[in-house]
Amino acid sequence: MSVITRIHARQIMDSRGNPTVEVDVHTESSFGRAAVPSGASTGVHEAVELRDKDKSVFLGKGVLKAVENVNTLINDALLGMDVTEQEAIDAKLIELDGTPNKSKLGANAILGVSLACAKAGAEYSALPLYRYIGGTTAKTLPVPMMNVLNGGAHADNTVDFQEFMIMPIGFERYSDALRCGAEVFHSLKSLLHDRGLSTAVGDEGGFAPNVESNEQAIELVIEAIGMAGYKAGAPTDRGGLGDGHVMIALDPASSEFYDAEKKKYVFKKSSGRELSSEEMASYWADWASRYPIISIEDGMAEDDWEGWKMLTDKIGGRVQLVGDDLFVTNSKRLAEGIEKGVGNSILIKVNQIGTLTETLQAIELAKRNGYTSVISHRSGETEDTTIAQIAVATNAGQIKTGSMSRSDRMAKYNELLRIEEELGSTALYPGIGAFRV
């Protein structure tokens, strides 16, 4: 039977040592479990993560209220529903919450239930989750965005921009791309060590050395690519630009250094320089011409629509411009962006919107309008590998799930290796084809 018989949540710990929600969903013949991630730099338009705010327990970060909501209100409402009716389950969760941002029950409570139901449905159907969600066409392994060097809110250093990532695009198999990423990661570690820079890793497994400038940060990554025996740049089949194996992706997380009162981007961790929206867009255009950059996420602040339009007009034809804080996995905000012609890609974080159905709707809306989708982790993760399954299920072609260290990050990469093995000769690795620029 596929009828839900019990839903139970508990408080567990995430990769940063903070509490998060884990949910078990039972039917008479299947079981699903999901753990919920949490972000450090969060967009103001995200669905609400419910925390207890009792400073005497876990410094206010407990999630027992969210757990209680699952074990009482949600459990009672969903008992007897068919676990394979995902859209009906998610609609019921949204109705039960009744707020536009899931602030009553908590997006962390709702998401845990939504994903656990999907897993129980997949088990009942005797299918892997990617096949259960995506059907027989689900066979594309994603190109990894590997966060190898950190700054901004993710590091205590003098780098303004949050993430410097490598994307191994010049390969025919996911497993070969993963090997490349690992070799570049270890080469970067050696490079930093030899220069007396820190090789400690941050929340997402990337290094956070105290380098002299933002430029030095990206140049270190490019040097490490060469040191590992690879070439930074595009492959030959992309406009005849060369025989590159690896390109650079950035997540400056510009909302974090945008001063809304001044309407300026303030490089407060490095030079103190202040740039207008137009100057910031020109800054990224300059970087895109100087460095082998294929993707920039949140290059402008989340509510700087004019700045986003300037940036898109300048480099949107040759660089993937990903909206994270801008779109927050929300179809309404994505539709607004499409109408205004800003960005050309959306970052997909399941906990920004709170249900699997709404997540899939955002991906579908992006696809219909020629925007790419990047399936993403959060800085606070667990051993849960659902996002790897979603990446393949939707043929998204790209995944952002950290560096080549920390088990919470490697769990997702390893799950993709298993899926590649399972798919055998039908598995596709898109490489540069994952991009529409």
UniProtKB/Swiss-Prot annotation:
Give the pathway listed in the UniProt entry for this protein.
Carbohydrate degradation; glycolysis; pyruvate from D-glyceraldehyde 3-phosphate: step 4/5
Localisation: Cytoplasm; Secreted; Cell surface
Q: Per its UniProt record, what InterPro entries does this chain match?
A: Enolase (IPR000941), Enolase-like_C_sf (IPR036849), Enolase-like_N (IPR029017), Enolase_C (IPR020810), Enolase_CS (IPR020809), Enolase_N (IPR020811)
Spell out the reaction equation it catalyses.
Answer: (2R)-2-phosphoglycerate = phosphoenolpyruvate + H2O
One GO term of the biological process aspect: glycolytic process
Question: Keyword Nucleus, does the record have it?
Answer: no
EC number per UniProt: 4.2.1.11
Keywords in alphabetical order, please: Cytoplasm, Glycolysis, Lyase, Magnesium, Metal-binding, Secreted
Give yes or no: UniProt keyword Cytoplasm.
yes
Catalytic residues? E204 (proton donor), K349 (proton acceptor)
Instruction: Name the protein family.
Output: Belongs to the enolase family.
Put simply, this protein is called Enolase 2
- Name the gene that codes for it: eno2
